[in-house]
């Protein structure tokens, strides 16, 4: 069990989160609003989740960008054991997808140089890759979450934490009354209507330094 941090004041709100690849607005809202966010290092890797995919808006609708992974043949693998695969030239494909989807958005060019390295450099482990992305996005969003990594699988009840590790997911998310998506400008809104809870990149590229006000 993760021990309660010694410097955590009584009554501090605690969120348990899984690792995400350019996670959704809802995930970053938790980072911004909770007094302490524990990022789970020891949960099992689950396919078709935000652990290795993000959702963006395109002219054809929502598109999933998925990072290919390598892991052992065991049925359940810890996130810390998941490796990033170089299969399929995915970095180039993901960057081109973002360029195609958001190249005409108000702030794509402003943030492009900060984000391009994630699609050029190689990372060995998915968790480390996602963590670096998270730190960079917090910097660009100008939020300073109290983010700590778990040293073993966390017991949400013992910590008095709100557990979002498997609640925030692309398919059949668990209802979250504390998250009410606030509409913001989107490039393809006239064609598809407002599409809520896409990757944080969608909010950043469309709203720039105003993005934090939607968190």
Language-model features, listed with the residues they occupy:
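Residues lining hydrophobic/aromatic ligand-binding pockets adjacent to catalytic sites
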Residues: 2-215
